[in-house]
Amino acid sequence: MAKNILIVDDAAFMRMMIKDILTKNGYNVVGEAENGAKAIEKYGELKPDLVLMDITMPEVDGIAALKKIKGSDPNALIIMCSAMGQQAM
C-alpha cells in the first residue's frame, strides 16, 4: 500500500516538483500546505504517514510547526528540508 505524504513548502514550484517525484515513485500525496500553520491544520485532518517540510516559511516556520505536530503526535514522522544552505538557525 502506498504511503500517504503531506508536502509543506511556501514555494509552489517546490511542492509541484516534490509531488511529481513522489507520485512517479508510487507515493500518495494526500495534501499540500504553504506554511507551518496550514501544515499543523492539515496534519490533524489527514494524519499522513510522513510529512516533508521546509524550514523557512511565512506565518509559522517549519521548526515551530514540527514542535506543534510532535507535541500532539509524538509518533509523527517528519523530514525537514530547506534551501537555507549554511545559515545559522
Language-model features: locations:
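Receiver (REC) domain active-site loop signature in two-component systems and cognate sites
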Residues: 57
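Acidic catalytic/metal-coordinating carboxylates
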Residues: 35-38, 61-64
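Conserved phosphotransfer cores of two-component systems
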Residues: 44-46, 69-76
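Short, conserved "switch-loop" micro-motifs in signal-transduction and mechanochemical regulators
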Residues: 84-87
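Active-site beta3 strand of CheY-like receiver
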Residues: 46-52
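Two-component/phosphorelay signaling modules centered on CheY-like receiver
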Residues: 12-31
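Conserved sequence signature across two-component system core domains
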Residues: 8-9, 33, 51
